[in-house]
Design a protein with these regions (language model features):
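Short, well-ordered beta-strand elements
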Residues: 28-39, 92-96, 114-117, 144-146, ...
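Aromatic- and charge-enriched surface segment that lines or borders ligand/interaction sites
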Residues: 83-125, 228
């Protein structure tokens, strides 16, 4: 369910649903403020680096990064950054990447960049090695060849987890938790436990981002979130308590 909610929110950000326009007629700036009770260090979402704890949820939720595959409403896998994939029936997977995708850093998303990303993920994430069982990644143009330690029919499902967001690990701000992904938005400012400000990725490969600026405000609890929404201080809410 969380994956579907995240995907729905990311789609809304691409279309600009719920945003508001500032004064100025045709040139009005379209902005959105989202209150979020989950985007905080206490919840292990202190940055948007998917290779750290559970930060991948914020990375994908707010349109910064994308995964090789994603889940449909019926929880089936469909292509995203990968065009196709196949398995030899044993330990070897062949993944063909989309063409003409560029990271927000300006780097082309080719197999070499994805190999580097996956290797960094396996070195730094606590769950990815045991989930994926990847022992080798080879790159050739837009084709990845992935080898696992044992047959793993669920490999592509795991690569659709938010920790599988494909990012440019050579980007300048990477070590500060600010990543360059392939999504429709780029991090402008990140202040942990306070706010995240995003602007459009002008090189986005799959449509035109509809918001000129997106701000995520970290709010402490559901009551604060609900009050802010009712007061009009935020345009949307994420992490509201179920009652």
């Amino acid at each position: 369910i969380s994956l579907l909610l995240t995907a729905s929110l990311a789609a809304a950000l691409l279309t600009g649903c719920g945003g508001k326009a500032s004064e100025g007629g045709a040139a009005a700036k379209k902005t959105m403020v989202i209150g979020d009770t989950t985007f905080n260090s206490e919840n292990w979402e202190e940055t948007v680096d998917p290779h750290r704890t559970y930060n991948g949820w914020a990375c994908i939720r707010y349109g910064i990064g994308e995964t090789l595959v994603r889940y449909t409403d019926s929880m089936e896998l469909e292509p995203w950054l990968a065009k196709s994939w196949s398995n030899d029936g044993d330990r070897t997977w062949t993944i063909v990447l989309q063409d003409d995708v560029t990271f927000s850093s300006g780097r082309k998303m080719d197999a070499a960049a994805v190999k580097q990303c996956l290797e960094h993920l396996l070195e730094n994430h606590d769950r990815a090695p045991s989930d994926t069982k990847i022992v080798d990644v080879a790159a050739d143009g837009q084709v990845l060849t992935v080898t696992t330690s044992e047959p793993n029919p669920a490999l592509m499902n795991y690569l659709g987890d938010p920790y599988g967001c494909i990012i440019d690990v050579d980007a300048s701000d990477f070590e500060n938790g600010i990543v360059a992904g392939t999504g429709p938005y780029v991090v402008k400012e990140l202040v942990t436990d306070d706010h995240l400000t995003l602007t459009p990725n002008t090189q986005y490969w799959n449509g035109t981002p509809k918001l000129d600026e997106l701000t995520i405000r970290t709010l402490s609890n559901g009551d604060t979130l609900s009050a802010a929404l009712q007061a009009g201080d935020i345009d949307a809410a994420y992490g509201m308590a179920y009652e």
